[in-house]
Amino acid sequence: MDNQEVSMDVETPIAKTNDDRSLPFSIFKKANNPVTLKFENLVYTVKLKDSQGCFGKNDKTEERTILKGLTGIVKPGEILAMLGPSGSGKTSLLTALGGRVGEGKGKLTGNISYNNKPLSKAVKRTTGFVTQDDALYPNLTVTETLVFTALLRLPNSFKKQEKIKQAKAVMTELGLDRCKDTIIGGPFLRGVSGGERKRVSIGQEILINPSLLFLDEPTSGLDSTTAQRIVSILWELARGGRTVVTTIHQPSSRLFYMFDKLLLLSEGNPVYFGLGSNAMDYFASVGYSPLVERINPSDFLLDIANGVGSDESQRPEAMKAALVAFYKTNLLDSVINEVKGQDDLCNKPRESSRVATNTYGDWPTTWWQQFCVLLKRGLKQRRHDSFSGMKVAQIFIVSFLCGLLWWQTKISRLQDQIGLLFFISSFWAFFPLFQQIFTFPQERAMLQKERSSGMYRLSPYFLSRVVGDLPMELILPTCFLVITYWMAGLNHNLANFFVTLLVLLVHVLVSGGLGLALGALVMDQKSATTLGSVIMLTFLLAGGYYVQHVPVFISWIKYVSIGYYTYKLLILGQYTANELYPCGDNGKLRCHVGDFEGIKHIGFNSGLVSALALTAMLVVYRVIAYIALTRIGKTKSG
C-alpha cells in the first residue's frame, strides 16, 4: 500500500461560500498566519525519586536538568531539525516548544514566544503536533479517521460537507487514496503500513492548515524511501510559510540537507545551532573533522554529540565540555542577536482566512457537535469489540449453564435459589468491571493528544464514552437474565422478573462505573486489574452470603459494598418476609422465608435505602472517573 507516489499538485474543488472565499484546498498552500517561534535560555528540570529497600523506604529526590539554557529561532518557511543521541533532550524541548509540558511534570524556565507573544489557546488550536507513537484508533479506516478529525477540529465557519471534502483533499495529497477504506490496525490487527500510519497522523494535524507544526521523530522505524516521502511533505509544507520543528534520530544524507536549520544537543546542552549546511564546516573550524571524506553528516554529528572524535586521547566528557564551550564562544552571541533582532510586524493574520485564530473562539465546535461526533466515532471504533463473537458466546454459555444447573428450582430448594441470586450478582460484578477498567488506560494516548490540541471539552468525550457503552452494558445482561431466570424457575410473576432485571442493570452500571473510576485513577492496566480484583472480592465477601456473622470492627465494609445492596434487592425482588416455604426434615412444615437462616440477617426492610445507595454509587463512581481524567492533557500554558 505504501508504494504510491505522494501527490503534490492534486486539488479537490470545493464549493464557494456566499462571501466568495473558495476552498480548493491544498495542504501546500500558503499558511494563513505565519508564526516566528523564539525560545530563549530554556532550562527544564525534573525531580526523580530513587527508592531504596524492599518497600521503597528512604526515598531520595534527585533533581535532574534535562534542558540547559537553549536559545534559538525558527522563522516561517524554515524546518528546524533537532538532532542528538537518545536522552539528549530532543523530545523534552519539542514538548516545551509545543506548549505540552504537563502540570507537575517538571519546572520550565526561560521564554518561549510566538510572534513575540506567549502561547494562547487560539494559537494552540492552529498548531499541529505529531507524536512519535501514532495515536490512532485501530478499528477506524483512514477516511473515518481524517473525517472525524476534520469534524472536530475545523471551526463552524466550515459547513459539514466542506469539512468532509477538506479531509478527503488532505487524504489525496498525502497519497492515501489507495488505502482510504483500510483500517488503521494495531499490534494484533492488520491494517495500513507504517508509512501510511505516519501520513495519517500528519494529515490529522495539517487539516487545520497550521502555521506551526511539531513532529517527534517522524521517520523513526521507516525505510529510507518512505522517510524521504515524509520529509518531502514537510519540506513542501514549510515552503508554504509554515514553521516546522522536528526531532530526528539518524537521517540519511539526502534527508539531512533538506533541513534548513539544525540544533545539535548533547546531554541537554546545545553544541550547534545554525544552518544545517554549515554544520560540518563549523565543527571543522573548531578542530573536529570526520576521518573519512564521504560520511553521512548525521553519523558524524551524533558521534560528536556522544563525545566520540578522531582524537582518541580526549575523553568523551572532556570533549562534550569543549563543544559546549566552543558553542558559547563562537555561536551563542550570533544566535541571541538573531532572536533579539527579529521583528514580526509582517506576521499579521489574513482577514480572509476561514481558519484564522479568531474564528475558533474558546472551542472550534459546540458542545453538542462534539458529543455527537465523539459518540459516532466511539461506536464505530468499538463496533467489533462491543458484541464480539467471543463475548456473546461467553454470556450465552454461562446463562444456559446456569439454567441447566438450577433447572426449574422450586421454593422448596430455597438455599439453591438464593445461591443462584448471589452468583448472578457476583458474575455481573466482575464482567462489567473488567470490561470498563481498561477503557481509559487504553485511550490515554489518544485523549492526551486530542485534549492537548484543544480539540474538544472533556465532558462531551466522557459522556459519549458512557452513553456509547450502554448497549453492551445493558443488552448482554438482559439476554443473560431472560434465559437464566425462566430456565431456573424463579418467581413466575412478570413484575418480579422486571424488578430483578432493573436491579441487575443498575448493578451492572455501578460495577462498570467502579471499573471506569479505577482505570482513570490508576491509568495502568495491570495495576488497575489487581486493585479491581481485590476491591470486588472484598465487596462480595462482605455481601452477606458467605459470612453471615461479621465481626463488628469490620462490619462497616458491607455498607460500601456493591454486592451487599444488590444481593438484598435481588432477594426482595423474589420473596416477601411472610412467604412460606417447605421446611423441616421431611418438608412437611411451613416456614416464613424471612426466618430462613441465609436471609434473616439480610432482612426485608430498607429496600429503598439499598436502591438509593446503588444509585448514589452509580453517580459517584463516574464523577470520580471524570475528575481523575481532568489531569490528562492538562498543560502549564494554554
Curated annotation (Swiss-Prot):
What is the annotated localization of this protein? Answer: Cell membrane
A single Gene Ontology MF term assigned here is: ATP hydrolysis activity
In the UniProt record, which residues carry a glycan?
111, 139
Which GO cellular component terms, listed alphabetically, does the Swiss-Prot or TrEMBL entry include?
plasma membrane; pollen coat
Q: How does it sit in the membrane?
A: Multi-pass membrane protein
Where does the record place a coiled coil? none
Please list the residues that bind ATP. 84-91
**Tissue localization of expression:** Present in flowers and siliques, at lower levels in leaves and stems, but barely in roots. Accumulates in the phloem. Highly expressed in the tapetum of anthers.
Q: Which UniProt keywords apply?
A: ATP-binding, Cell membrane, Glycoprotein, Membrane, Nucleotide-binding, Transmembrane, Transmembrane helix, Transport
Question: What is its quaternary makeup?
Answer: Homodimer. Forms heterodimers with ABCG11.
Its annotated function is as follows:
Together with ABCG31, involved in pollen coat deposition of steryl glycosides required for pollen fitness. Together with ABCG11 and ABCG14, required for vascular development by regulating lipid/sterol homeostasis.
**The protein, known as:** ABC transporter G family member 9
Identify the taxonomic lineage of the organism of origin: Eukaryota, Viridiplantae, Streptophyta, Embryophyta, Tracheophyta
Its gene? ABCG9
